[in-house]
Amino acid sequence: MDQLRQSLLEAPIIEKGDYEYFVHPVSDGVPVLRPELLREIVIKIIRKVEVDNVDKIVTPAAMGIHISTAVSLMTDIPLVVIRKRQYGLEGEVSLSQQTGYAENEMYINDVRDGERVLVLDDVLSTGGTMRAVLDALDQIGAEVVDTVAVIKKAGPNELDESDHDVKTLINVRVTDGTVVIVDSNGDG
């Protein structure tokens, strides 16, 4: 059974202003994240990317952490979390994260020029977070081997015109209070 697809079809919908927002264990931490769903996601990610050529997994805090940790455990690839807190460590790079909902500063540590990275996140919506992360990694000189978002919300995003391709596991949209599956195989 396709746990990810089914869980999205059953996801509660809330309204934030004029925006319909699905509440999902992958993107929000509620309802409860079942281990079989997380396992399915990790297996799909590992099958979709070339993990043999990756030095580090990079993910923005907070909702990419559980997915990236599970992938790290399965592949033995070290994990770097892009934090919202500045530590002032040598080599720390700041980036400005702008989403459809908020704007924040984030900080990358422990990624160096020439390192090959896999970027993972929970959802690709406006593309603001992913664009900022990829631009910062380019600035550092890291080689982005692959980029994966578990769920893509259909519609234009900031990466449509970029040089970076983002693979996804499933593409959805929310219409009239319901999650609609646009592509059950995602992009890439």
Curated annotation (Swiss-Prot):
InterPro entries: HGPRTase-like, PRibTrfase_dom, PRTase-like, Pur/Pyrimidine_PRTase. Its EC number is 2.4.2.-. It holds the Pfam family Pribosyltran. It comes from the Archaea. Belongs to the purine/pyrimidine phosphoribosyltransferase family. Archaeal HPRT subfamily. May catalyze a purine salvage reaction, the substrate is unknown. This is HGPRTase-like protein 1. It comes from Haloquadratum walsbyi (strain DSM 16790 / HBSQ001).
